[in-house]
């Protein structure tokens, strides 16, 4: 599990390789990740948007931005949490994801809550020792 906290917003991520949706012979690898966002702060916040940096096993970086997560812009009162699962296809058997959520307070102030960097690992990775 990977965890980061920004201004009382805790983001925990767990990833897994999805063999049944992957085809290694065609360089298609699919990963699922589950995110839990917890408001440990003292004020209500709303998740407005997301920004992901996805880096494949060759170091190629793709940036993804969008409104909300899984079609929602959840509002979190102090002590509340929101959990969702999504997925990421790669052309390599391993990679890395990291990013941030744009959060907004009731007063209209926006800030970036860090999504911790987490690895995308499959059993198809060939490691070489030098």
UniProtKB/Swiss-Prot annotation:
Record Pfam families: DUF525 (PF04379)
ApaG domain span: 3-127
Gene Ontology annotations of biological process type: error-free translesion synthesis
PROSITE patterns: APAG (PS51087)
Domain of life: Bacteria
InterPro entries in the cross-refs: ApaG_domain, ApaG_sf, Uncharacterised_ApaG
NCBIfam families: PRK05461.1 (NF003967)
HAMAP family: ApaG (MF_00791)
PANTHER family given in the database record: F-BOX ONLY PROTEIN 3, POLYMERASE DELTA-INTERACTING PROTEIN 2
Name of the protein in its database record: Protein ApaG
Organism: Methylobacterium radiotolerans (strain ATCC 27329 / DSM 1819 / JCM 2831 / NBRC 15690 / NCIMB 10815 / 0-1)
């Amino acid at each position: 599990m990977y965890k980061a906290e920004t201004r009382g917003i805790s983001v925990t991520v767990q990833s897994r390789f999805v063999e049944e949706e992957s085809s290694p012979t065609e360089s298609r690898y699919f990963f699922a990740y589950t995110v839990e966002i917890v408001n440990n702060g003292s004020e209500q916040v709303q998740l407005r948007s997301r920004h992901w940096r996805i880096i494949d096993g060759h170091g190629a970086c793709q940036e993804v931005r969008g409104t909300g997560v899984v079609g929602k812009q959840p509002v979190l009162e102090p002590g509340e949490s929101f959990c969702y699962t999504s997925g990421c296809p790669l052309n390599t058997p391993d990679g890395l994801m990291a990013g941030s959520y744009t959060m907004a307070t009731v007063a209209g102030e926006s800030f970036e809550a860090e999504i911790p960097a987490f690895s995308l690992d499959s059993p198809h990775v060939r490691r070489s020792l030098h």
